Amino acid sequence: MAEIKNYTLNFGPQHPAAHGVLRLVLELDGEVIQRADPHIGLLHRATEKLAESKTFIQSVPYMDRLDYVSMMVNEHGYVLAIEKLLGIDVPIRAKYIRVLFDEVTRVLNHLMWIGAHALDVGAMAVFLYAFREREDLMDVYEAVSGARMHAAYYRPGGVYRDLPDAMPQYKASKIRNTKALSKLNENRQGSLLDFIEDFFNRFPKCVDEYETLLTDNRIWKQRLVGIGVVSPERALQMGLTGAMLRGSGIEWDLRKKQPYEVYDQMDFDIPVGVNGDCYDRYLVRVEEMRQSTRIAKQCIEWLRKNPGPVMTDNHKVAPPSRVGMKSNMEELIHHFKLFTEGFHVPEGEAYAAVEHPKGEFGIYLVSDGANKPYRLKIRAPGYAHLSALDEMARGHMIADAVTIIGTQDIVFGEVDR
């Protein structure tokens, strides 16, 4: 009898479940995966090399475009590395604003993840619900920075500006009548902080909705339980971080273990899984959304009571005020120099890591004393996770490959960078 050979299948790069531009070369025995070989680099934009020809501040917008669903957290790692090299202090209010927006970004990321993951597995409704909530958070981004996605809001030494006192409101148009407008603008009457607080007061109920649809859903559990199991030892060996590591039962979160900004003053818990399968990672991320809500509420409470500066008073780094610029020639020259030549960073190297929604996002920065980085290395969490795909998918059905890609929460901007 003739021997049955394995056959090879190309999964992606234009597959809807490939999360962008992933090309998987699958070796199959019938419908069982024997080997999964990820091919990356289809979204490579040479970010690390581009940064070498840009001033330090000009590379901030590049960070937004790495993991383009967790924009501000990428910026955070980068500005922390610059601040380490410069040795400057950040005003306490700016630290709280950064932590607040890190958590807003974490929720943004997890909403995208739960919607896309559920859609891949076959649950349509969650995707629509998740995007309903994301819309409000995108409006928060827009109110504070003027952009819905690529905010470029963090700066070395603080943030671009303080939180606005008024929330932008919807205006009448062909598709929105006055009655619909009044309902949409109902919670936009106050400041940005009021709007964020209102969102996080409503949000736990929204998370309950997602859990009602998924957590005890028979089909959801059949598709996730026991799929892509990673043991705690193996998770550490493969360099997994974030929810991928915590799902395997290892309590590691940089916000607790190596606190930065004001996370050491925040009261929150680290959710940890037991079995290390896709279902545990799902539960960990859902609980992370609840913990982010707790942190955000603490930040809002503090920010209400404590006004103050949001940018360092070190004039080598901070641009002069608009008012000063229009009345003082020296300040105008200083502003011009700062945005053309940029500031010079002392010689040295620094590594700064933040707890990104996907794992540990690190920036290794080398300076030779010039106004541009000598070398910028980005440690993307998704890169290590994707390398574990082969091991996680072996022995599973081809349909489970989709579940495993979903649970890894991969975005190719940061993998290919």
Swiss-Prot record:
Keywords: Cell inner membrane, Cell membrane, Membrane, NAD, Quinone, Translocase, Transport, Ubiquinone. It catalyses: a quinone + NADH + 5 H(+)(in) = a quinol + NAD(+) + 4 H(+)(out). The keyword Zinc does not apply. GO terms for cellular component: plasma membrane. InterPro entries: NADH_Q_OxRdtase_suD (IPR001135), NADH_UbQ_OxRdtase_49kDa_CS (IPR014029), NDH1_su_D/H (IPR022885), NiFe-Hase_large (IPR029014). It is an enzyme of class 7 (translocase). Belongs to the complex I 49 kDa subunit family. NDH-1 shuttles electrons from NADH, via FMN and iron-sulfur (Fe-S) centers, to quinones in the respiratory chain. The immediate electron acceptor for the enzyme in this species is believed to be ubiquinone. Couples the redox reaction to proton translocation (for every two electrons transferred, four hydrogen ions are translocated across the cytoplasmic membrane), and thus conserves the redox energy in a proton gradient. This is NADH-quinone oxidoreductase subunit D. The lineage of its organism: Bacteria, Pseudomonadati, Pseudomonadota, Betaproteobacteria, Burkholderiales. The gene is nuoD.
